[in-house]
């Protein structure tokens, strides 16, 4: 009886010693380092303690860069499944919203291709994980089923089925430009004799435009302020709006139309003095004149 009790205490103490060392190693600890830090534990006792902690899910094995296996405290959510499913689920969970590629799963788990695909299929069937096709690539990455992927994977509001939605972008640019132009016109009408007031009243905060888009239900999906800022950047480059240092924007003044006479070829023709109707050099035979008239 005393011998059994001594063995139980010895097992509990050895597990406690191993656990304390692993807990102190934030990035995990490899077997060689653990052995050197537990010189008082016989090899069989140490291995028994490790196996017990792994079985109880208190510790987990993780493959570090270079293929070295490390022990670390298991902080992953426990799921009902095989050991392979636990390992794969843990790796996907650690990737959070960024997701993880199948190559990284293979390297991190040490599973062969057949084992990995079987495990992934099982986790997908249980609705514990899902696949995401990232923008700009045909490769799939894996992410927990309950997590929304990072915008860097999906492309955000302006992508539909991994394709840039140009029509949506152009619509939003037009809405932003029209709203800003309406505010500018209102500012001029309200302050006909005060140019400074016209200028100040024509500036608006991006939040006002975002609120307008939401209230008018221009989109069927929420538009974040970050998304709107991306649209406004395009509108600035297009010359539709201008932005000042405090972030407010206003519509650019309407572009004045240029008279076609400005580009009439006669103004720079070196033989204009010899050009006469009915002559060899004449407007009727001038190729430059024909091209200019065609562009009107």
Swiss-Prot record:
Compartments (UniProt record): Nucleus
Q: Which GO terms describe its biological process?
A: transcription by RNA polymerase III
Pfam families hit by this protein: RNA_pol_Rpc34
GO CC terms in record: RNA polymerase III complex
InterPro entries on file: RNA_pol_Rpc34 (IPR007832), RNA_pol_Rpc34-like (IPR016049), WH-like_DNA-bd_sf (IPR036388), WH_DNA-bd_sf (IPR036390)
UniProt keyword terms in alphabetical order:
DNA-directed RNA polymerase, Nucleus, Transcription
The identity of this protein, by name, is Probable DNA-directed RNA polymerase III subunit RPC6
Species source reads Caenorhabditis elegans
